[in-house]
């Protein structure tokens, strides 16, 4: 481990050693699109397993500052929700230093159906606990409390719309169609605003239990039904098991009856956020962008939004025809 002095990894290591008064003895870059590292540091006899979560930046479609997630993690930890312990916030390079929690992501990797069901039950209990939290500490930290049915339904969608409008390189009829539909079909709800994870269903687990809730950068105050919708979108990439069972479990824990049309509406809203965020990247890709990966994300979540809209309006869609592969100089890469 001998990074160059001006290398980003070297800066991270130097900051950690200075902040913790420790010596970093191992460092591994996480294989993902945002900068992140797994590290081990020694401080006297103590051995610290660490994780540095770097800033995704606006170029990757982000709309929330990383400080937002740091404050969220602080407040959830204080409230007894299982989240990683925080060690500090680094200004350059920007990132959150936290505990490397034991466990793994992706419930599809559970050892068997019993473990999958046990973890799912535990997560739904945690989600119910999160939705029952007092919102005042989050409001004091800067989260905006919705005061109208439109704000409850649309949540942070206007933020994503503005970001898309500022960055878009060309018109996109699909995005315009879904956005207009969402504004025209704002649903009624009797739910009180709650803290919602937004991109729910992200956690680490071990031996049948959730060890930490993670990836809370999109969290806000809004309709708790939004987190049931978030489980659906997460399930597209990381299968979460029987979501009907999970939703029933949540209803029992909270003692409420969920309106499936509310969950459907939030599924459309949250699904289309991904295409809104990455369309400008697809149209003007920065160097080294995995363009095909972004294109896949665009169509997976755009299709999800359209299919749920069709379900809500009782329309029957023709199944898409398989696309024949076409050879090109780039085929070998994919």
PLM regions and their residue ranges:
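Generic recognition of well-ordered alpha-helical segments
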Residues: 14, 68-71, 125, 177-180, ...
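Residues at helix-coil transition
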Residues: 21, 78, 102-103, 125-128, ...
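ATP-binding pocket architecture of kinase catalytic cores
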Residues: 28-155, 159-173
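All-alpha amphipathic helical-bundle segments outside canonical DNA-binding/catalytic cores
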Residues: 87, 258-269
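Active-site activation/catalytic loop segments of kinase-like enzymes and analogous catalytic loops
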Residues: 225-258, 269-288, 303-312
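ATP/Mg2+ or Mg2+-diphosphate-binding catalytic cores
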Residues: 276-334
């Amino acid at each position: 481990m001998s990074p160059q002095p001006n290398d980003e990894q070297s800066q991270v290591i130097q900051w950690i050693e200075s902040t913790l008064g420790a010596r970093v003895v191992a460092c591994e870059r996480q294989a993902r699109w945002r900068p992140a590292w797994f590290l081990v540091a020694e401080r006297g006899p103590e051995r610290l397993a660490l994780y540095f979560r770097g800033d995704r930046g606006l170029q990757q479609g982000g709309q929330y500052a990383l400080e937002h997630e740091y404050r969220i993690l602080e407040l959830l930890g204080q409230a007894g929700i299982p989240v990683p312990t925080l060690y500090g916030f680094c200004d350059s390079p920007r990132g959150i230093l936290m505990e490397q929690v034991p466990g793994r992501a992706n419930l599809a990797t559970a050892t068997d159906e019993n473990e999958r069901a046990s973890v799912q039950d535990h997560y739904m209990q945690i989600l119910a606990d999160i939705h029952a939290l007092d919102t005042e500490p989050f409001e004091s930290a800067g989260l905006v409390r919705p005061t109208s049915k439109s704000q409850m339904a649309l949540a942070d969608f206007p933020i994503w719309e503005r970001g898309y409008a500022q960055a878009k390189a060309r018109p996109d009829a699909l995005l315009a169609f879904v956005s207009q539909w969402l504004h025209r079909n704002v649903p009624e709800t009797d739910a009180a605003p709650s803290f919602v994870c937004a991109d729910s269903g992200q956690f680490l687990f071990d031996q049948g239990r959730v060890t930490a809730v993670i990836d809370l950068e999109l969290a806000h105050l809004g309709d708790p039904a939004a987190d049931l919708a978030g489980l659906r979108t997460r399930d597209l990439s990381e299968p979460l098991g029987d979501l009907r069972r999970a939703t029933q479990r949540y209803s029992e824990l909270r003692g409420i009856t969920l309106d499936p049309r509310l969950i459907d509406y939030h599924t459309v809203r949250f699904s289309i956020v991904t295409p809104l965020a990455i369309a400008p990247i697809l149209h003007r890709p920065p160097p080294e962008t995995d363009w095909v990966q972004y294109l896949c994300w665009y169509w997976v979540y755009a299709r999800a939004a359209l299919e749920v809209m069709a379900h809500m309006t009782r329309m029957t869609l023709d199944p898409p025809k398989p696309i024949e592969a076409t050879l090109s100089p780039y085929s070998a890469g994919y």
